[in-house]
């Protein structure tokens, strides 16, 4: 069986969190939003669990240093979080780049799926 390959990107704002995922070698694109206008938390969590359960491999521009830690935190919280909480984590990652840029990295053994 071929490993599922997925490209992922996140965007964070104080009141909006977005995650876009595209299954490579297919036309399947998934867009998830957590905001006052739309709450895809449950479906995003289910999608990320599907990636985990199917041993997917994810790719992204800054998955190691930014998107991955946000996804990891979201998964650790069981998908029960807010855009504000994810934004605060994103800001902590950005602000730590000069002092301790590895503080928010997720060890490979702690990742819900490969990235």
Predicted segments, located by residue:
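Short N-terminal binding/cap micro-motifs at the start of the first secondary-structure element
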Residues: 14-19
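Short acidic-glycine loop/turn motifs at beta-strand connectors
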Residues: 23-27
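Conserved DEDDh/DEDDy metal-dependent 3′-5′ exonuclease domain
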Residues: 30-115
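Two-metal-ion RNase H-like nuclease active-site motif
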Residues: 3-12
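Short, conserved beta-strand segments within well-ordered enzyme catalytic domains
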Residues: 7, 20, 59-60
